[in-house]
Amino acid sequence: MGLAGTKVKQRFGLDPRNTNWSNDTSRFGHQYLERMGWKPGKGLGLVEHATTSHVKVSIKDDNLGLGSKLAKKQKTDEFDSGECSGLDVFQRILGRLNGKEDQINKEIERKRKDNIINGKWGIQFIKGEVLQSTWDKEAKKLLDKGTTKKRKIDSVDSSEESTTSSDSKQHKKKKIKKDRKEKEEKKTEKENSEIKKKKKEKKEKKEKKEKKDKNEKKEKKDKNEKKEKKDKNEEKEKKEKKEKKEKKDKKDKKDKKDKKEKKEVKEVTRDSMLMPKEQLNQQIATRLSVRSKWIKQKRASVMDAKALNEIFMVTS
């Protein structure tokens, strides 16, 4: 590429292999495991010969199943050719020569079906099996190294005794199965009773809650109704008071008006006309003084009863 190529800088840290944390014995986890009896180089399971190295995380860049790469490295069966092609045909020829043609054909057919299924779903299924040497079928537990060795030695001696004790073993197995079944039934009954109890309690709680909510709603409704009724009554009383006040004000105004009118207007009769009236203190303007004088004279003549009698020629 030369100078025109892209520059790639590599930076190496203080711990490129990331081993400081594993070598550090002052960590809490390391100290805690040592207190429990663990030592560096030992496994963490029941089996001592398990993996003791650190687990490394690798990026998965394909759609294969878990463990498919390991299966390619290690042959799963005698017909697993890996990357070699045409080995199954060679195995057929060898099978015909050895007289195991049927067995080999079955194995090849099974392998062909597995390949078809794996190609269809895009997943490679790996069948897991348990080693017979580390697993006790009767007790269903992992065996230690000592017990496995003893079993191997005793298996030769106890081959003759196995025939006689087969009946007793079957009886024991039946008894164990029966006890297990009874335990499971008891467990299921207990679980069912607990579930029923929980359901009942839940139902009761729900009913109580619903009842409480109903009562609260009813009380709230009653309070609202009472409040509305009270507000309506208060409004009605206020309205009535207002109307009464308005009526009273109107009546008072009317009475005042009537009194005023009565004061101002009096009935005009013959006697009232003949009777002398009080002189009014009326301020008259200067320009109307002549007219007012003439009006006063005329009024004076009307007020005088004697003068009127003379005018109308009435003899008393």
Swiss-Prot record:
Subcellular location: Nucleus, Nucleolus
SMART domains for the chain: G_patch
InterPro entries referenced in this protein's UniProt entry, alphabetically: G_patch_dom, PINX1
Bias (Basic and acidic residues): 179-195, 210-240, 261-270
Domain G-patch: 25-71
Leader sequence residues: none
Keywords: Nucleus, Ribosome biogenesis, rRNA processing
A single MF term (Gene Ontology): enzyme activator activity
Entry's Gene Ontology BP terms: box C/D sno(s)RNA 3'-end processing; negative regulation of telomere maintenance via telomerase; rRNA processing
GO cellular component terms, A-Z: nucleolus; nucleoplasm; small-subunit processome
Biased composition (Basic residues): 196-209, 241-260
Coiled coil feature spans: none
Kinase among keywords: no
Main location: nucleus
Region (Disordered): 146-280
Role description: Involved in rRNA-processing at A0, A1 and A2 sites and negatively regulates telomerase.
Family under the similarity heading: Belongs to the PINX1 family.
Family matches, as PANTHER family: G PATCH DOMAIN CONTAINING PROTEIN, PROTEIN PXR1
Name of protein: Protein PXR1
Source organism per UniProt: Debaryomyces hansenii (strain ATCC 36239 / CBS 767 / BCRC 21394 / JCM 1990 / NBRC 0083 / IGC 2968) (Yeast)
Gene from which the chain derives: PXR1
